[in-house]
């Protein structure tokens, strides 16, 4: 499918760990598989590197059904409960230390539901990640999120979608209490001071009203059809976000054949649509004209900014030259890393991008045209 990174759920709500933990006995040491010496995290990380994927780890510490932890909170009252709470915080910190120190550089560490507030019931994991994985993406606690959830588990984000945010994470004290948090997550804030780009997550088995993050038998008919995946791609990647697909390994630890086949089809279709532009141009200016080698049908264009310089474009329009005259085919606001515009097919000899509003000189690294059947 053209994925750049993969993230393994190393531990989830049961508390069971998929590695050889020295601090959490409820792990692969407790099973008969490989005589209790297996390490799925290591196998996963090694496989990612073998096949050119960046490895990440997803850590669930918000819930632990074995230990009776609910929303970071140990059950009970009084001194005994307070001692259990302190012990659980240390356990979580030690598990994070193990995962940060045993597997080399990690691309991302993702805490399910966040890692909470270390000044309260949450473990103090951010200093551990900073010390042992200083270059990884951190997601997230009450103080910091290197990217943000896009406001739904539909694999889409709203438009416009800005990578900037008014605070270093959602639900931060710097965000005014009357702000709609979900809308803010979906759209970001064009004037925000923090770079917190959006991600759009959804399970691959999410069709027909299902929403399966974990494997279920006889569930292959709920894999998203290709046309729905492409729609999600255009409404996530094409709106300046990252698309994250949840995959469900079966009891043998394998991605089922049907899921694998759909991912291959997905990657093939992305390449079919967008790997061969009719023409392409770049430049640091407010207007770019893309000349085609002949009159031909056009129904898509892609615009990309050099995000090393931030998001400068605030409003734009795209025109097509049809029978010698310019006519507007689409317009928008946010661009960022990538904006995919689909419009009614026109027979054109050129496309023209005009930036109508910007906060600095636009730095456009890609303006390209496509004809997609």
Residue ranges and their predicted role:
Residues 348-350:
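Extracellular Ig-like/FN3 beta-sandwich strand-entry sites
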Residues 321-323, 372:
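Inter-blade boundary loops/turns of WD-repeat beta-propellers
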Residues 359-373:
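Edge beta-strands of jelly-roll/beta-sandwich modules across compartments, strongly enriched
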Residues 1-320, 328-343, 354-363:
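Mature catalytic domains of secreted/periplasmic carbohydrate-active enzymes
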């Amino acid at each position: 499918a053209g994925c750049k990174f993969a993230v393994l759920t190393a531990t989830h709500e049961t508390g069971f760990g998929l590695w050889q933990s020295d601090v959490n006995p409820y792990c692969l040491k407790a099973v008969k598989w490989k005589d209790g010496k297996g390490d799925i995290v290591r196998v996963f990380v090694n496989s990612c590197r073998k096949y050119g994927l960046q490895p990440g780890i997803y850590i669930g510490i918000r819930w632990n059904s074995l230990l009776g932890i609910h929303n970071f909170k140990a059950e009970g009252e009084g001194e005994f409960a307070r001692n259990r709470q302190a012990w659980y915080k240390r356990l979580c910190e030690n598990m994070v230390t193990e995962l940060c120190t045993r597997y080399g550089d990690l691309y991302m560490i993702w805490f399910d539901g966040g890692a909470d507030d270390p000044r309260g019931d949450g473990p103090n994991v951010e200093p551990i990640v900073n010390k042992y994985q200083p270059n990884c993406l951190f997601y997230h606690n009450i103080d910091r999120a290197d990217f943000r959830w896009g406001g739904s588990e539909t694999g889409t984000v709203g438009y416009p979608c800005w990578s900037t945010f008014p605070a270093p994470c959602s639900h931060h004290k710097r965000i005014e209490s009357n702000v709609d948090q979900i809308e803010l997550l979906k759209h970001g804030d064009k004037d925000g001071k923090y770079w917190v780009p959006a991600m759009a997550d959804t399970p691959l088995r999410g069709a027909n009203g299902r929403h399966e993050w974990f494997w279920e038998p006889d569930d292959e008919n709920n894999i998203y059809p290709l046309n729905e995946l492409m729609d999600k791609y255009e409404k996530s990647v094409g709106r300046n976000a990252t698309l994250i697909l949840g995959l469900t390994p079966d009891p043998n630890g394998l991605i089922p054949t049907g899921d694998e086949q759909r991912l291959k089809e997905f990657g093939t279709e992305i390449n079919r649509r967008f790997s061969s532009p009719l023409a392409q141009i770049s430049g640091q200016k407010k207007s770019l004209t893309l000349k085609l080698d002949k009159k031909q049908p056009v129904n898509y264009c892609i615009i990309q900014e050099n995000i090393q310089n931030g998001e400068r474009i605030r409003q734009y329009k795209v025109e097509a030259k049809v029978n010698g005259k310019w006519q507007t085919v689409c317009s928008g606001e946010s661009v960022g890393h990538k904006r995919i515009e689909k419009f009614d097919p026109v027979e054109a000899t050129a496309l023209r991008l005009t930036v109508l509003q910007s906060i600095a000189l636009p730095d456009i690294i890609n303006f390209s045209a496509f004809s997609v059947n």
